[in-house]
Structure formats: structure tokens, C-alpha cells
């Protein structure tokens, strides 16, 4: 499982995601933009406290992008071509999601979450809401798809929804037989108990008490020191 974020989002959200994946036995890679010392400290503690493998990569943002919010939303897809060759397969997710249940890997080489455009939207926004970007699946055999998504994002414009527009346009050219289509039974933002991924969309990530309670219950970073001490004396 793979996600990307800036340093502040890592501190706020990554521990819950990592522990939720640890509970279902799935390895995770997180790409972090502009990490600082506290990010590396959290990363080191997580690696020692979990049973699955956590790997991280990094980049410096350099000049501030025209639309930083859009840049960070696209970061995971822009870095995918660098990371995918070393992974047999990856599920690309939001760093602020949590895994509530285990899942089986798709049998196709690609997967995404198509949906109807958001009611009342037109033009760019309507095109951008045809895809939920919170779960995209690629195997190493789908490098052409990973590269195409990255290239479309680079074409721009770098504004909100460009990642979803890139996904929509690229997956429209992929053979249907090579695609697994995810739906609300796999990922949802209404926080239904038997779905795999809960993701916090918009204000829900700060206001929905069910989602916040799940995030809090997964985040065992505060218990890590005691846990690591117990492991050392056993």
C-alpha cells in the first residue's frame, strides 16, 4: 500500500494508516515531501513498533507550487513511476484513510474507482469528479499507465481535480479486461462498518466522530515506547 504527503500530514495522519495496515498484515510505503527531524523520529518509532514493513522516500518541494493543495494531491501519482518498479503491486491511497478490514489483491494489472460526476457540477469540476482518487491499483506490468498518469498531471494545469482528470482520461484508454473497478463497498466516506477503507473527505476528516474515533483507536504511537521496552526485555 502506498501513500504520499507533506510533513504535517504525515505527523497528523500517517500513524493511524500505518497501524491499521499493520493489523491486516499489509506493507506500506509513504513518500514524504520536505520531511523534518520529527518526521524521521516518528518513522523510526513506527518501523520498530510494527510487524509489517514500512519504507519511506522523500523529495524537496523546491519553489512553492502555484497551487500547493493540488500539488500535494498529485504527489503520490507523480512519484509512482519511481516507486512502482520496486513493488510487485501497489494500492495507492490517501494518507488520511484507515483500513477497517482486510482485502484481497485484484487479479488485474490496474484498478480505480469510477463514479458519476458530482451533482450540480459542470466543466472541469464535473470531469474531475468522475473518479474517486482515494484508491488506485497498479502492478509493475502497468508502468505505462503510471507514466501516462504522471505525464497528464505534468501537462496541467496544476489546479484542484487535475489528479482525478488524469486518472479519468488515462483509464478511459485502458482495456476494460485489465481494470478492477472499486466501489463504495471497498472505499467509502460514509464510514460503513463492513467496508475496507474509510477516507475522510472534506470537513468529514475533522468533524465526523465515527471516523475520528477510528483514527484515534488505530493511532498507537503514544504506546510505542512502552511496547518497544517490553519487546526489549522479553
Where on the chain are the PLM-derived regions?
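GT-A fold catalytic core of metal-dependent nucleotide-sugar glycosyltransferases
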Residues: 72-121
Amino acid at each position: 500500500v502506498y501513500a504520499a504527503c507533506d510533513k504535517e500530514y504525515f505527523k497528523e495522519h500517517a500513524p493511524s494508516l500505518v497501524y491499521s495496515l499493520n493489523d491486516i498484515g499489509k506493507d506500506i510505503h509513504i513518500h514524504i515531501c520536505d520531511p523534518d527531524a520529527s518526521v524521521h523520529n516518528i518513522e523510526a518509532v513506527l518501523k520498530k513498533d510494527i510487524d509489517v514493513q514500512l519504507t519511506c522516500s522523500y523529495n524537496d518541494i523546491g519553489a512553492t507550487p502555484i497551487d500547493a493543495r493540488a500539488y500535494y494531491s498529485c504527489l503520490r501519482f507523480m512519484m509512482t513511476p519511481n516507486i512502482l518498479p520496486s513493488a510487485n503491486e501497489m494500492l495507492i491511497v490517501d494518507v488520511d484513510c484507515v483500513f477497517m478490514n482486510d482485502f484481497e489483491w485484484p487479479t488485474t494489472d490496474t484498478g480505480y474507482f469510477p463514479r458519476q460526476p458530482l451533482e450540480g457540477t459542470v466543466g472541469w469540476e464535473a470531469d474531475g469528479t468522475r473518479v474517486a482518487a482515494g484508491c488506485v491499483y497498479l502492478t509493475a506490468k502497468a508502468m505505462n499507465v503510471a507514466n501516462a498518469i504522471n505525464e497528464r498531471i505534468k501537462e496541467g494545469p496544476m489546479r484542484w481535480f487535475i489528479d482525478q482528470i488524469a486518472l479519468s482520461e488515462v483509464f478511459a484508454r485502458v482495456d476494460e479486461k485489465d481494470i478492477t473497478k472499486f466501489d463504495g463497498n471497498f472505499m467509502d466516506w460514509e464510514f460503513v462498518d463492513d467496508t475496507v477503507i474509510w477516507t475522510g473527505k472534506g470537513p468529514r476528516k475533522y468533524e465526523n466522530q465515527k471516523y475520528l474515533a477510528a483514527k484515534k483507536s488505530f493511532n498507537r504511537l503514544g504506546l510505542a515506547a512502552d511496547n518497544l521496552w517490553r519487546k526489549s526485555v522479553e
